[in-house]
Design a protein with these regions (language model features):
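Active-site core segments that coordinate phosphate-bearing ligands/cofactors
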Residues: 1-2, 6-27, 50-176
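Conserved N-terminal phosphate-binding loop of PLP-dependent enzymes in the Aspartate aminotransferase
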Residues: 30
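Short active-site oxyanion
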Residues: 33-38, 59-63
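Glycine-rich phosphate-binding loops at beta-strand->alpha-helix junctions
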Residues: 40-48, 67
Length: 176
């Protein structure tokens, strides 16, 4: 079983239709028969196995579809309706916004995926080395991270044409 928000990252899902793409599967020599069943994040995808329920001393509870990491984070933060979003900065950096329809934005290389909430999508930009990049700069300059962050003025406007794309870590945005 695969859940929609996680399946969207496989590139085999027709994200707008929330179904496997026969065209993309065929392009990679696969068929629907080789793919898992698709469920929404809130759908029951199975039941806890009897042996595990017995071992853990709990009933055979339903198991929900769940969600991909960022979609599940969004649900936990209440980012489930259009116009809501979050910014997460850690080892990776994510800018996530819930949307009411499939609205790809390939011109800006922003991902458009299914949300873990039925009939909802999300757009996100991701870089897998957000705070790691600051740590790297701190190490090579010998300056503490707070000191480097203090160099950025409070009234920063539009992004500068100068860019930084760390080559040692994967970047999902702006290259998709």
């Amino acid at each position: 079983v695969a859940e929609m928000s996680d399946a969207a990252g496989t590139l085999w899902l027709d994200v707008g239709r929330r179904d496997w793409s026969d065209k993309l599967l065929a392009a990679t020599g696969l068929t629907r028969a080789q793919m898992p069943a698709l469920v929404e994040g809130s759908d029951v995808s199975g039941t806890l196995r009897a042996d595990l329920a017995q071992r853990w001393g709990i009933p055979r509870v339903p198991v929900a579809g769940g969600g991909g990491d960022n979609a599940a984070t969004a649900c936990g933060m209440g980012v489930m309706t259009p116009g809501t979003g979050f910014l997460s900065l850690g080892t990776s950096g994510v800018l996530f916004a819930a949307t009411e329809s499939y609205a790809p934005n390939t011109g800006d290389a922003v991902h458009t995926f299914c949300h873990a909430i039925p009939a909802t999508w999300h757009q996100m930009g991701v870089i897998l080395s957000a705070s790691d990049s600051m740590s790297w700069l701190s190490e090579i300059t010998g300056r503490a991270v707070p000191d480097l962050a203090g160099l950025v003025p409070d009234d920063v406007g539009a992004p500068s044409p100068v860019g930084f794309l760390p080559p040692w870590f994967l970047a999902l945005s702006p290259r998709n």
